[in-house]
From Swiss-Prot:
It comes from Cyprinus carpio. One of its GO terms (molecular function) is carbohydrate binding. It is found in: Secreted. Keywords: Disulfide bond, Glycoprotein, Lectin, Repeat, Secreted. Glycans are attached at residue 27. This is Fish-egg lectin. Its main location: secreted.
Amino acid sequence: LDCTVIDGNLKQIDAGSGSVVGVNNLNETFVLIDNVFTKISGSLKHFSVGPAGQLGVNTANNIFKYQSGGFVQLAGLLKQVDAGGDQIIAGVNMYDDIYCLNMDANNKWPSSNTPWVQINGKLKYYSCGPYSCWGVNSNDQIFIMKDVSSNVCSGSGSFINIPGLLSMIEVATDGSVFGVNSQGNLYQRTGVTRSKPDGTDWISMVACPNGHKHVSFDLGVLWLVCVDGSIRKCILTD
């Protein structure tokens, strides 16, 4: 990995659709503007950006979508939300229940109802890409949901366990999958394609000298939050 340090300190980062966002330990929200993490108004504990828009949740688990210059609340409660799917929203609540919102409902919003779809299972973290969603449960076991589309955000409806243990996982808009385990090690899933969305193996890589906390990938750039909160921007090298 070819990495550079970006000024700032974050606990969570997300890159998608050409944007990069994050939050710090004070739940202040940041957007990358001209390679500088710039504070914007609003308090969030998790912030996600992607084809579904800019979405976040606060410490009370309220859900917000950034719309015309400010955050507007969506109906429902989630502790973590993801905007990386094909205009679908996905996330998990405080009980590790899993929900998603189809493209039509997301794009029609704000409307009188927000028809969240519950997905069978329990996950503490859930992230979607163009054709699959990946998640981890409270035991750090890894699961994939296949056949996810903009109109069927729940996919096939049944999770498949993938060998390995991760504490967080992110699927990029191009389908790439990266994750971090509880020891702070960084992994990429190899062999991921539309026809084989679960890929083949985990390979480890190092971007942070003292361990990794959070990872996201977009447009060929890997964005890392290290254990100490410092930020790395890395280019994948063969």
